[in-house]
Each structure stands twice: as C-alpha cells, then as structure tokens.
C-alpha cells in the first residue's frame, strides 16, 4: 500500500526523483508540502490549493486534538472528508508544538503534561495517545511523537531528549495498528553529529515506510542547518522517502535535494503571503512598497499560477495596502505555487542530468533554464 519508487538519480549529486504511493494518491518527489495546521492552509480553499500543483499537505495533531478534537474529525469521515481534500495528508505528531507553545508541567518517559494554550486546562499526551489521535484523524502519514529540545540546549540535555524520542518511537511502533496509514520516525540530535548519527541509525532500524529529520531550522545558525543536511542522509536508508521538516527556502531545499532528501514543508509561503510578501525567483518582494503602485505586470510573467495569470502587482498592492483579505490569499497562492514550481524544476533537471547544488533555473545562464 505504501511504496517509494525511485525513478531517476542524478550523476552529479545524491539527488533522485521518485513516487511515494499512498492510499489517497501518489506524491512525486522532490516535493514541497504546504502547511495546513488546522486542516486548512490559511486563507486558501482546497480547490485553490489544487491549482498550485500541491500533491500532499501537512496538518498538525497537537492543534487538531485541542480544536475541534479528533473524535469530531473521525465522525465526519476523517480528515480528508472533513477538509474536502482527496490527496495525501501527513499529520505532524505535535511534539514541536508541545515543547515550544505550551507551558510544560511535567515531562517523563510516559509523556508530557502541559497547559492547553487555548483555555489553560491540563492535557496529557503520550506516544500511545498521539498515535490514537492520528489514527482517528485518518491521515495517510502519521509522525512518531518526538521530543524537540530548543537549539540552545547543551549536549547532555539533547542526549537525554534523544533517548526519550527513541523510547517514544518504540512505543509508537507498538501502538500504531492502522494498515492504511504509514508511520514515519523522526531523527533528532540537535547540532551534534554523534547524536544525529546515533538517532539516524536507531530510527532506520525500525524499517518504517519513511523517515524524517526534525529539529532543523528552529533558530540555530545556518551553518548548523547545513551540517545536518550534509551529514545525516548518509545514515538513512536509500529506499525510503526522506522528509526534512520545516525547510522552505530555495537554497536549503536545493542543498537538501542534492544530499538525497525528498519531501519538505514550511509555513513560510503563507506566513509571508499574509504579510504582503511575494516570492520572485530567489527574492522576496514586499508588495506594499510604493514601487508597485503603478506596476501593471504580474508578480512573475513566467509563472502560471492563478494569481499571475489574472492579477497585476498594482492590484495586489492596492489590496494589501487596504488590508483586503483577497490580497493575502492571492499572494499566498503565488508563493505556494512558486515552491511547487521550484521542486518540479528540480525534478526535471534531475531527469535531464543538469541539476546542481546551487540550482537557480531562472538564470538564463543556467543549463537548467529550460526547466523554469
């Protein structure tokens, strides 16, 4: 039911194209996943999302458990029916949110007790509970519950959290019983290569349908992000999809693909879109700026998204300067389309054997310009 089929390999790098087969359709890789935390990509309908070329989205177990609750989603027919999205869905376990958003009361090998950030009530999440929530939600891919410490933690604290993550993974594997849902483990270990290697080998030993690398891009220096991207893949199985969590910049996606990663997610395209910032090649444009007031060209004349086909920079400038919701939706649509287009161009370049680690297909001098 879940299979990762490698279709082509790059001769210059570790990049590959593939197809991840799921019960709700296939995901062509490399692939960017938009983030729909509460079963919605903010400000965008499922129909609009399809127009961007999105093939898989991410929702969050932590937030959906708090509101509206997994039982209601299950009663509706599952998360796909609940949000009217018939393509694959991955649910993050909520580990990162528990440790970054909630006021912790107690943490043990059994789980985490914390205060609900919505109403202050006490909530307890264990690996077993997180698995049950995700099984009730009915996503295609469930993520194991992990302990994601702050990037400022020292090596001893990160090692302690890593052992907890590994213990929880064992419990997740024992609890997860849904044949039409894949379970992915998560590699942790912070900025320490020894711990990352240990975690990658331990997580890989379970032979799960896929494997993720977490605790990346959580405030650490870019050199530390690149160290993880460069070093962890060598300890991961080749025949499984590799998911690098929380990465959405073109530079990091290109580097990660070159090192053999396949799937990415990030809130960046919609978060920036809601603030009036649009992607153009490898730049970010603040559409509120006065220079766009009389500019009647699209954001990007080479882009085929619904926004660029129908609306000018001047119109978008007018919308965002007047805080019209439509403007934020249209820019978010373009930003998501831009990242999907980028990963599509990477795929084409890998197949044509012209992908490079500094992939920039918008440059006319690039040998991969034809993919853009």
UniProtKB/Swiss-Prot annotation:
Cofactor: how and how many bound: Binds 1 zinc ion per subunit.
Enzyme superclass (EC): transferase
UniProt binding sites for substrate: 92-96, 146, 188, 215
Gene that encodes the chain: tgt
Protein name per the record: Queuine tRNA-ribosyltransferase
UniProt GO cellular component terms: cytosol
InterPro entries listed in its UniProt record: ArchSynthase1/Queuine_TRR (IPR050076), TGT (IPR004803), TGT-like_sf (IPR036511), tRNA_ribo_trans-like (IPR002616)
RNA binding: region residues: 246-252, 270-274
Single GO biological process annotation from the record: tRNA-guanine transglycosylation
EC number: 2.4.2.29
Cofactors (names): Zn(2+)
Catalytic reaction(s) noted: 7-aminomethyl-7-carbaguanine + guanosine(34) in tRNA = 7-aminomethyl-7-carbaguanosine(34) in tRNA + guanine
Role played: Catalyzes the base-exchange of a guanine (G) residue with the queuine precursor 7-aminomethyl-7-deazaguanine (PreQ1) at position 34 (anticodon wobble position) in tRNAs with GU(N) anticodons (tRNA-Asp, -Asn, -His and -Tyr). Catalysis occurs through a double-displacement mechanism. The nucleophile active site attacks the C1' of nucleotide 34 to detach the guanine base from the RNA, forming a covalent enzyme-RNA intermediate. The proton acceptor active site deprotonates the incoming PreQ1, allowing a nucleophilic attack on the C1' of the ribose to form the product.
Pfam annotation, one family: TGT
Positions of the catalytic residues: 92 (proton acceptor), 265 (nucleophile)
UniProt keyword annotations, A-Z: Glycosyltransferase, Metal-binding, Queuosine biosynthesis, Transferase, tRNA processing, Zinc
Pathway(s) served: tRNA modification; tRNA-queuosine biosynthesis
GO MF annotations, alphabetized: metal ion binding; tRNA-guanosine(34) queuine transglycosylase activity
Keyword Transferase carried by entry: yes
UniProt similarity note: Belongs to the queuine tRNA-ribosyltransferase family.
Subunit structure: Homodimer. Within each dimer, one monomer is responsible for RNA recognition and catalysis, while the other monomer binds to the replacement base PreQ1.
Binding site for Zn(2+): 303, 305, 308, 334
